[in-house]
Amino acid sequence: MRLQPGCPGNERFVTWLSSYLHIVNVTTILCQQSITHQTLFTPDLLVSHEGEEMRSVKVYEEAWPLHTPFVIARGSRSEAHVVVVELEEDGVKGVGECTPYLRYGESDASVLAQIMEIVPQLEKGLTREALQQLLPAGAARNAVDCALWDLQARQQQQTLEELLGIELNSTITTAQTVVIGTPEQMATSAAALWNKGATLLKVKLDSHLISERMVAIRAAAPEATIIVDANKSWRAEGLAARCQLLADLGVAMLEQPLPAQDDAALENFIHPLPICADESCHTRSNLKALKGRYEMVNIKLDKTGGLTEALALATEAKAQGFSLMLGCMLCTSRAISAALPLVPQVSFADLDGPTWLAMDVEPHLHFTTGQVHL
């Protein structure tokens, strides 16, 4: 079993056997600054078969404490759990990261198990194209897909953007999130973010105190561009009045007001501001059902199952007349780096996940309030 060097504290070991009879060691290490769950996959054989190129594969999980609780309509988080895939081929390493999401039926264990099932194929040179057929869209495929992209870019001694022929500005505007609290707390947070340089605020709401919170926030940051995320906590009843309130306060967009199963209520619904699909849009297969209901889709690599499908979704969504938003889960800079090629296509980028961490991965992207610096 592997221990994180220099991390004192309690240690708990769990060993389980995969369906391929490979042993996975799960080591939980509690440290003063961070809590790291590390799962290392070690194949039984790492020697190459004659005439066959071989990769080494590592799969492990991490937990990154947040400096402030992340409070949204569905609850509160105090740490970010991620699963990391490392692929190494001829001395070149590619890394991908995902964030398992319970609301999508995912857990750290289920995502690890999904990835473990395809390790033999990864060892033998699995391609991104073949991966799309082996795993469904979701966190597990995302980690592997991004690791394959990263591996290819590094093999060619290019950045991911160079590999794709995409140019990025040296500074990217990202939304900064205002989490749920009292109207006074949210207004104070909005004012602090604005005063530090954030020009785009993403306000989390549930079904309570909507008017009080939004009026206070707008008064605290009168010049900010504001987008609102209800995290599917609203109902169709009263939606028209809430949309009008947001429009009157100059809100630029409303994200996922209703649960995905209630999307039919948005059919031919007249609304004064754009509505963006988050939980209602995972891949290209969802686009047909969104027509006439949403004007924008939020692309997240953990929903699409990686950059491969995310790029295809962006192209198809724009062709069908949708505007785009780029989002993220609570994550490290590894996950944001993988999503950056999509930035030139989107109207809003919400990439502040790593800014909630008490400590980011090394090396990491450089964030200032409201901006990512490349």
Predicted regions and their residues:
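N-terminal capping/lid subdomain adjacent to the active-site entrance of alpha/beta enzymes
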Residues: F41, H49-I226, N231-A240, Q244-D248, ...
